[in-house]
Amino acid sequence: MTALITQEIGSFRKPDYLAKEFHKIERTPKFTELAERATRETLEVFERSGLDNIGIGGEMFRWEMYEHPAERIKGIIFYGMVRSFDNRYYRKGSAIDRLERREPFHVDEVKFVAGTTKKPLKVPITGPYTMMEWSFNDYYDSREDLAMEFARIINEELKDIASVWKQVSGGRRLEIQIDEPATTTHPDEMDIVVDSINRSVQGVDGEISMHVCYSSDYRLLYDRIPDLKIDGYNLEYSNRDTLERGLTDDKRVGFQDLKYFAQINESLQRKKFIGIGVTDVHIDYVEPVELIEDRINYALKIIGDPDLVRINPDCGLRTRSREIGEQKLRNMVMARNNILKQL
């Protein structure tokens, strides 16, 4: 099936037994044991929910999307904690020397998850522009230079993942998701965004998508779709939408940008898919199946081809309880299933 594939974006709330001990036991056999246990339990949640693509099992091996790779890069030191956009905190690093990988970021995680489930997977990895934007630069001549260095390192990581994937995939296609929440932070740096992402995925054989959330203007990204060497986009829309039912523009205000995406996509010889965020990860309110159906149907009215539309939460569900997260995913899949019956 390729129509309206349901997918998870990345993170999911860690069980308390892992979250409370994470930093105390990281990089020990005990950590591996608990992270593997949490991954198996989260995969069960995703499979109970009916997801087609179960990501990487909720990122149980990762504490935070910036800190995890930054800790594994030589040339970065950490100065302290800063607040992120979702009112959580991360350790912000600074590039003080030439960047080199100390060790792989996600290879062991990919091996474990691929060997634990036969479902399709998607490996999220923090993109070069966001790594640059969220770092201090005390070494390189320019922001562009730093972004391209992160791109070089990410390309090494992706090639290692691709190599391992051949051994553990069981015939499944490699799917990579470049996470770039900082994409449109500086409109005058979109050339850096494009060049660094293209460098990151150079020579990597597989399906490449890009995840962006909470952008003030997706049109900055859409304008560069012809230049980006990726296959699709998984984006946030529900956080900016209403909670009212309906298929009119005033009810589906959060999805208006899709019209511009469709216009750009129509001009391409090789069309890109769009993963639409149909449930808000920043509220505990569990959107009713009927509301999610309206959001999907509205998107289909704009995009047309259901093979070009995928269904996902706005972002990772780590900010919600595991129970709320599962309910949101379950309703999302139910809404998709209802629509498939009508197609």
Swiss-Prot record:
<dbReference type="GO" id="GO:0003871">
    <property type="term" value="F:5-methyltetrahydropteroyltriglutamate-homocysteine S-methyltransferase activity"/>
</dbReference>
<dbReference type="GO" id="GO:0009086">
    <property type="term" value="P:methionine biosynthetic process"/>
</dbReference>
<feature type="binding site">
    <location>
        <position position="315"/>
    </location>
    <ligand>
        <name>Zn(2+)</name>
    </ligand>
</feature>
<dbReference type="InterPro" id="IPR022921">
    <property type="entry name" value="MetE_arc"/>
</dbReference>
<protein>
    <recommendedName>
        <fullName>Methionine synthase</fullName>
        <ecNumber>2.1.1.-</ecNumber>
    </recommendedName>
</protein>
<keyword id="KW-0489">Methyltransferase</keyword>
<comment type="pathway">
    <text>Amino-acid biosynthesis; L-methionine biosynthesis via de novo pathway.</text>
</comment>
<dbReference type="InterPro" id="IPR002629">
    <property type="entry name" value="Met_Synth_C/arc"/>
</dbReference>
<keyword id="KW-0479">Metal-binding</keyword>
<comment type="function">
    <text>Catalyzes the transfer of a methyl group to L-homocysteine resulting in methionine formation. The physiological methyl donor is unknown.</text>
</comment>
<dbReference type="GO" id="GO:0032259">
    <property type="term" value="P:methylation"/>
</dbReference>
<dbReference type="Pfam" id="PF01717">
    <property type="entry name" value="Meth_synt_2"/>
</dbReference>
<keyword id="KW-0486">Methionine biosynthesis</keyword>
<dbReference type="InterPro" id="IPR038071">
    <property type="entry name" value="UROD/MetE-like_sf"/>
</dbReference>
<dbReference type="GO" id="GO:0008270">
    <property type="term" value="F:zinc ion binding"/>
</dbReference>
<feature type="binding site">
    <location>
        <position position="213"/>
    </location>
    <ligand>
        <name>Zn(2+)</name>
    </ligand>
</feature>
<comment type="similarity">
    <text>Belongs to the archaeal MetE family.</text>
</comment>
<keyword id="KW-0028">Amino-acid biosynthesis</keyword>
<keyword id="KW-0862">Zinc</keyword>
<feature type="binding site">
    <location>
        <position position="211"/>
    </location>
    <ligand>
        <name>Zn(2+)</name>
    </ligand>
</feature>
<keyword id="KW-0808">Transferase</keyword>
<feature type="binding site">
    <location>
        <position position="236"/>
    </location>
    <ligand>
        <name>Zn(2+)</name>
    </ligand>
</feature>
